[in-house]
């Protein structure tokens, strides 16, 4: 709920530039996250979808071929101002796109905040074309914490496979890096 407030959206980039390094125990910084995102998704050719785009950080890696969706009008306003491009108000569990519309989907840290993480994984799979790829980064558990989805790597792998992905989950400190392909 707090993430929908304008002050949180305005200050989010300050947290985002530091959080990857802090939560990964220094194993990955934001620049490294964006490099991995590019390396994993760009070879698919685009277009790309960023689910839970927030302030549009992934646009720095994916460029104009990216569409960002977020349920927060405040975040989308900041995204459009800081990283102009195509953004839509939408939830990751109910994406407003046709089946197979994208070659790559990125889901960053907001994955932990989905009310239905399994539904979000199924939706990501639905909008990916055959051979499409998913990139994800999220806080690992074990278990939910303060209402956040925080799976173990094994539970996350089962969730992704259940949604139709062949996936790899790498633990980086408290973060899980997801590299998945349509199965």
Regions flagged by a language model, labelled:
Residues 132-139:
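Conserved beta-strand signature within the Rossmann-like core of class I S-adenosyl-L-methionine
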């Amino acid at each position: 709920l707090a993430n929908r407030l304008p002050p949180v959206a305005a200050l989010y980039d300050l947290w985002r530039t530091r959080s990857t390094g802090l939560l990964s125990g220094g194993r990955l910084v934001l620049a490294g996250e964006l490099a991995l995102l590019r390396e994993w998704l760009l070879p698919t050719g685009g277009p790309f979808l960023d689910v839970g785009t927030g302030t549009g950080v992934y646009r720095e890696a994916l460029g104009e071929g990216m569409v960002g969706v977020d349920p927060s009008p405040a975040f989308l306003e900041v995204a459009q101002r800081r990283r102009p491009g195509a953004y839509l108000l939408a939830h990751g569990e109910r994406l407003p796109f046709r089946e197979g519309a994208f070659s790559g989907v990125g889901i960053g840290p907001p994955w932990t905040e989905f009310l239905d993480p399994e539904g979000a994984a199924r939706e990501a799979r639905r909008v990916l074309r055959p051979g499409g790829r998913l990139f994800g980064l999220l806080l690992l558990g074990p278990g939910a914490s303060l209402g956040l989805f925080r799976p173990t790597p094994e539970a996350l792998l089962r969730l992704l496979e259940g949604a139709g992905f062949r996936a790899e989950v790498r633990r980086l400190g408290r973060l899980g890096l997801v590299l998945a392909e349509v199965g």
